Regions:
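Hydrophobic alpha-helical transmembrane segments of polytopic
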Residues: 50, 171-177, 198-201, 273, ...
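Cytoplasmic-side transmembrane-helix entry/capping segments in multi-pass membrane proteins
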Residues: 44, 101-113, 163-173, 224-229, ...
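Structural signal for membrane-spanning alpha-helices in multi-pass inner-membrane proteins
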Residues: 61, 150, 182, 187, ...
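Hydrophobic alpha-helical interface/terminus motif in multipass membrane transporters
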Residues: 3-6, 91-92, 126, 154, ...
Length: 411
């Protein structure tokens, strides 16, 4: 909502997309380091540091008088967000037992859907009575309340003692070289051959990383934890995040551009996805008592396949789209929550925090890959079932089929 105003006020021109790019790069850099920090510092200190970074970044964004300052501020804000997003996957394990953990993680996972309604309403209200700077200032009192709650509640008796092991500099360096190559391949739009070469180099670096980390007593990336089940979960989460971007980013665009709905109206159409997400997680322990893990996963992938195909056929009635999104919400609700819990429960207690940090990174990389791929597909003016959104959801359908095959063969 505020991008046109920011672009004009700060003379950003075609560089306006850096507002998102800088934030995302910082977020991805911060994600994996959280696990290492938690092995050396109490979680309460890491959480406060993340909130302070986010608050300082938000404050600086609001004070920005030029585009360079805004981008630097977004990087700081992104670092704070990266820390907090990783903690959102770790804290439920320390604080709650199953089945309550399912409910909490369902609420956490569906926050984006709730924000799709609150965001346009709140943002539009702020821009109606104030300048875009207050879109950032509003984060500060919220962060202060969060810091108070962290100080009050983040005391976990099961938290491990602080590690004294040597820092794995080589593993960290190789890992961030790998991430840098992946990010370049995702963000570069000049010479596509460089993207391909970057992916090839990333694979080579990843192989070196796995070889090195196998022989380190306290590795930055605990590769020994990646058994068949954990590896399958990471792949599933990466692909599911790609699919979620198809729904999260481009169904609202379709509703507004093709069907003429307002941002608030499109948010209301999408909201049933979040309701279904939360509802399923509140009843997940009952479902698991009757069905096996494999069966529920396969049902979830099937629901995602069915919902994407139905919308791909070009339905234009918002009420019907909202109903179909309930199916997608049930699918995403199970996959995301169960993936998180599997990593929490099936990795060793000593490495759980690191693994959950990398899990969060996988989710964010999937979101980045998804937004890029789905953006290209949405821009295509013809497809299997028609233009724009239908290309996006056709890709979701293909990925859903791939996930079904993956779980049938490897689980």
């Amino acid at each position: 909502l505020a991008l046109p105003t920011i672009k004009q006020d700060l003379n950003a021109g075609n560089l306006i997309s850096l507002i998102f790019t800088a934030y995302f790069i910082a977020l991805v850099i911060a994600n994996p380091i959280v696990g290492e920090l938690l092995s050396r510092f109490k979680i309460i200190y890491v959480a406060i540091a993340g909130l302070l970074l986010f608050s300082i970044g938000s404050f600086m964004c609001g004070l920005s008088t030029n585009f360079t300052m805004l981008i630097i501020s977004r990087v700081i804000q992104g670092f704070g967000s990266g820390v907090l997003m990783s903690l959102s996957q770790i804290v439920p394990k320390l604080a709650f037992e199953i089945p309550l953990r399912y409910k909490i993680m369902g609420i956490v996972g569906s926050v984006w859907g709730i924000s799709s309604i609150i965001g346009p309403l709140l943002g539009g209200g702020i821009l109606e009575f104030a300048t875009w700077h207050w879109l950032f200032y509003i984060n500060i009192p919220i962060a202060i309340i969060a810091i108070i709650l962290v100080i009050w509640t983040f005391h976990f008796p099961e938290e491990e003692t602080v590690a004294k092991s040597k820092f794995d500099t080589k593993g960290l360096t190789l890992f961030y070289v790998f991430i840098g190559l992946i990010m370049f391949a995702l963000l570069n739009q000049q010479l596509l051959l460089l993207n391909f070469l970057s992916f090839i180099l990333a694979i080579v670096v990843a192989m070196c990383l796995f070889k090195v980390e196998k022989h380190v007593s306290s590795p930055f990336l605990p590769v020994v934890e990646f058994n068949r089940s954990i590896t399958l979960v990471f792949i599933t989460d990466l692909l599911t995040a790609i699919c979620l971007m198809g729904f999260n980013l481009y169904i609202p665009v379709y509703l507004q551009e093709q069907l003429g709905l307002s941002p608030l109206q499109s948010g209301l159409v999408i909201f049933p996805l979040s309701v279904a997400w939360i509802t399923l997680n509140f009843n997940l322990h009952r479902i698991e008592a009757k069905l096996s893990r494999k069966v529920i996963y396969l049902l979830s992938f099937t629901l995602l396949l069915v919902s994407s195909i139905i919308i791909s056929f070009g339905i234009k009635l918002p009420v019907l789209i909202a109903f179909v999104l309930i199916l997608a919400g049930l699918s995403f609700g199970y996959i995301y929550t169960k993936d998180s819990v599997i990593v929490q429960e099936e990795t060793s207690p000593l490495q759980m925090k690191k693994m959950m940090s990398f899990y969060g990174l996988t989710k964010n990389l999937g979101a980045s890959i998804g937004s890029t791929i789905m953006g290209y597909l949405y821009a295509i003016q013809s497809g299997i079932f028609g233009p724009n959104l239908h290309n996006v959801l056709s890709a979701v359908a293909v990925i859903s089929i791939g996930l079904i095959v993956l779980w049938v063969v490897f689980f």
